[in-house]
Amino acid sequence: MNPASFRDCKAWQADGLSLSTTSNEACKLFDATLSQYATWRNDESLGGIEGCISAMQKADPNFVMGHAIAAGLELVGTGSSLRLNERLAGDVARLVEMAAGQSLTPRERLHVSGVEHFAKGRHSEACEAWEEILLDHPRDMLAIKLAHDGYFYLGQQTPMRDSLARVLHHWTPQIPLYSYLKSMYSFGLEETRCYDEAEKVAKEGLEMNPQDGWAAHTVAHVHEMRAEMDKGLQFMASTEKGWEVCDMIASHNYWHWSLYFIEKGQYEEALTIFDNHVMRLCKASGSMLDMVDACSMLYRLEMEGVNVKDRYRELLQQTKPHTEDHVLLFNDLHFLMTALGAKEEATSRRLVETLQELAEAPGENLQHQLARGLGVPMCQAMVAYDQGDFGKAVELLRPLRYRFTGIGGSDAQRDVFQQLLVHSALKSDKKQHQKFARCLLVERDAARPNSLLTNRLIQRANALHI
């Protein structure tokens, strides 16, 4: 990134996105922070996102949007719980108080409102605030990106796609970060199963910028959902040099790479990626995305019969401190995978019990509201599966199978729970569950023809003589 290209006060105003500060340095550092967020990359030459935020707040300690982006990025990282992190709770409270005492533009006030909503677990209201900004300011990349992430956490695939469709025509290829706008739109297309168009738009973005890790990520999803394993392997290998520099998405792209190997039954190759990339990057970053990917990968391998207990124990050191965060159900479910895999009964029990407590008095937090009817029974199903009570796991998961989107994430990420339901049904001693497993596999084969993983499971079902 070229620091000379970052916008000062006048440049932001010229773009119709005025910032309430007189500090040109603060404006440029805000732009640098936003650019790194949009590109999934901490640029060491700029000091990374944390360095830019620190310098920005020193340049103008009263810059409301500087504090808004700082709190917003920490919150969407989902690694800090407002209930447990007094410093973060204080930052959000000070942001709201600071905004109330200053003369801000309506756009800036909506940004503060969005951050406050998100902080309190009102994710839908947060997205509404960012969408309100985009009605008048369709080139506000911060609002675009925060809404995109918000919809992702909500599992709202169509709004995630349409949010980008509404603003894309206001941009041109000459505007900085345009390729990343295309890549976000391509991901929305992929998640709404428009695979041909998703691949086309993503590759247009990659042609403009081979280092667009999010565009590469969309193509990886397309190959996964089509069960095009060899094409996926070839694509990831041919584009690795571009996206491996995107430190905030690189581990996730390696995770996608590993899924192709798991699908093909090439477990040693998958474990090599886990050891050399996924786990290494997870330990280095402490990022929730990297963490949940590592959890999911081991859980999938274990369901395939691979012994990964030692790796679970190593990963537990990363996930255990977040046992009681309960920021996202998606995170909780993945942390439980590792606690169960590492045979840490106390940690597993504490995670489920504290989630149950929040579900009983959720307040306005959407994740806690969803916990009672979705998150907690999914956790209980995983515990039942771990204890060998496969019939109970089926009975808990079966009524929820069309509601899994509510935990957020992508189709590819949530597929681990569909696999769990199939494995539970196959292992249940009840014939009706085994017949249900066969039906699930017929569905799976129709949705993703030529899946080697599905074929292996069908062979297992056939061996039961259902």
What are the functions of these language-model segments?
Residues 22, 27, 35-54, 58-105, ...:
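Inter-helical turn/loop elements of alpha-helical hairpins
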Residues 24, 31, 35, 69, ...:
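"A position-specific structural signal for the A-helix of alpha-solenoid helical repeats
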Residues 39-40, 77, 120-121, 154, ...:
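Structural motif corresponding to the intra-repeat A-B loop/turn of tetratricopeptide repeats
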Residues 45-49, 88, 126, 160, ...:
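Single-residue signature of alpha-solenoid repeat helices
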Residues 54-60, 96-102, 131-138, 166-175, ...:
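Solenoid-like repeat scaffolds
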Residues 66, 109, 142-143, 177, ...:
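TPR alpha-solenoid repeat register
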Residues 249, 254-320, 332-335, 340-341:
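A conserved active-site cap/scaffold subdomain adjacent to cofactor or substrate pockets
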Residues 377, 385-466:
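C-terminal non-catalytic interaction modules
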